[in-house]
Amino acid sequence: MTDSTYDVTRVRTYLQGLQTRIADALGALDGTPLATDTWQRGPAERLRGGGCTRILEGGRVFERAGIGFSDVAGDALPPSASAARPQLAGRGFEALGVSLVLHPRNPYCPTVHMNVRMLIATKPGEAPVFWFGGGMDLTPVYGFEDDARHFHQTCKDALDPFGAELYPRFKQWCDEYFFLKHRNETRGIGGIFFDDFSEPGFERSFDLMQSVGDAFLHAYLPIVERRAELPYGERERDFQAYRRGRYVEFNLVFDRGTLFGLQSGGRTESILMSMPPVANWRYNWQPEPDSPEARLYSDFLVPRDWV
């Protein structure tokens, strides 16, 4: 967080363009265009503003793909946003960002999440305070080391122009953030995560956010192209549904974006579009020793240096 010099219009224009570019690329890959759901909140509602949700369900490649843009404002930062910044509690805010979660149909094709956002906290008589956040992370059902290395290398390449120290810092942040404490396991193989970022000022921070957003298709599409047509059976789909249960647990219990949206009176359909279309839970299930399912736990659901 830093001084009050910023340009929301440029950020908004970039984010709307990013959503369109990603939606067009995913629609072309799947063969099904993503539907558009534009929404607006009235000036008297708890949360003002609006957004656009691009959504695909039941596609050839993607069982569910959701990309949301929102630009909303409220009278008081919700607890999930001000807990680490008590000096900002009670301030008004504007939050704008793009968030996506893609759940492929093929169990060999990993789920992915990406988010880039800007928040501005305001208080009459005081300078506004802004910061950026975002990142991307990969959640495989069946792990492939080539995919993990490619994803992390692309993340590193996006950050390196802004300082060689940022990738290891944001990678560790991601490993620690996307962790299910009650399961004692990571959600996936991580990636990068950052929040409260404005150290270099608006221009450089905005450039970094754009670099992360622009890297997403390069990080993920080659993996989809390698894995989406691999043959699979009922066993793999069953394990996929089981692992998706972990995704649900994290998003509803720990995810700050989900909590921010629900606590601030956000649009529930857009907030919960990250949920997988099918998930299941089993009592005390364990994978067979030395199986591909066991390898996910031993080789991938532990923090590793992938690059």
From Swiss-Prot:
GO terms for cellular component: cytoplasm. Transmembrane segments: none annotated. A divalent metal cation binds at H103, H113, H152, H182. GO terms for molecular function: coproporphyrinogen oxidase activity; metal ion binding; protein homodimerization activity. It is found in: Cytoplasm. Substrate binds at S99, N115, V116, R117, G265, G266, R267. Its cofactor is a divalent metal cation. The record marks H182 as: Important for dimerization. Pathway: Porphyrin-containing compound metabolism; protoporphyrin-IX biosynthesis; protoporphyrinogen-IX from coproporphyrinogen-III (O2 route): step 1/1. It comes from the Bacteria. One of its GO terms (biological process) is protoporphyrinogen IX biosynthetic process. Involved in the heme biosynthesis. Catalyzes the aerobic oxidative decarboxylation of propionate groups of rings A and B of coproporphyrinogen-III to yield the vinyl groups in protoporphyrinogen-IX. This is Oxygen-dependent coproporphyrinogen-III oxidase. It comes from Burkholderia orbicola (strain MC0-3). The lineage of its organism: Bacteria, Pseudomonadati, Pseudomonadota, Betaproteobacteria, Burkholderiales.
